């Protein structure tokens, strides 16, 4: 394609790990810190290197972030906003416009970009500051939409031995990067990984039970209101 976009129609997505992190940070901060958005390069560096909410944790330099921003601008995924009152330029993502993603899809995709492969329950919990999903079914619907785009933006990772929950990963790094991510997920289920995986499944089950309880409580309140 002469017009560079996020994906090539034949080969799919091909962003590198730094581009994915930088773009994910811009998407996240647009939700959680709207008063400080768009972001300066320094703010993007800080967001990229956070110790929480990031997997893997990275230690990017200002130069690496700036070069990634330049490449993303060339792909028309990021724009630089120069303001007369600002001493430095600031950057904003264009994913919503380029790929017609509503807020729920942006939130789920950003969560996958910043934290790696996750279950639908984990995505729901971890994306809460960006978008509050009513239940896991709502997350499943969003993941389905992202997986049906052309080229697809999300896919299910093959289950590791001994796991029940399906994990999902973004496809923005290309098919090979997705395969490597799946292998990393599977290799994480050694002695310690299996325990972490089981813990995650139990946490997921607790969240499911809470969802069901909330539904039952809501139905009971509606029933009781008929007699008041």
From Swiss-Prot:
Annotated InterPro entries: DUF480 (IPR007432), WH-like_DNA-bd_sf (IPR036388), WH_DNA-bd_sf (IPR036390)
Disulfide bonds: none
One Pfam family matching this protein: DUF480
Gene3D superfamilies per the UniProt record, alphabetical: Winged helix-like DNA-binding domain superfamily/Winged helix DNA-binding domain (1.10.10.10)
Domain of life assignment: Bacteria
Sequence similarity: Belongs to the UPF0502 family.
Protein name: UPF0502 protein AZOSEA09860
UniProt organism field: Aromatoleum aromaticum (strain DSM 19018 / LMG 30748 / EbN1)
Taxonomic lineage: Bacteria, Pseudomonadati, Pseudomonadota, Betaproteobacteria, Rhodocyclales
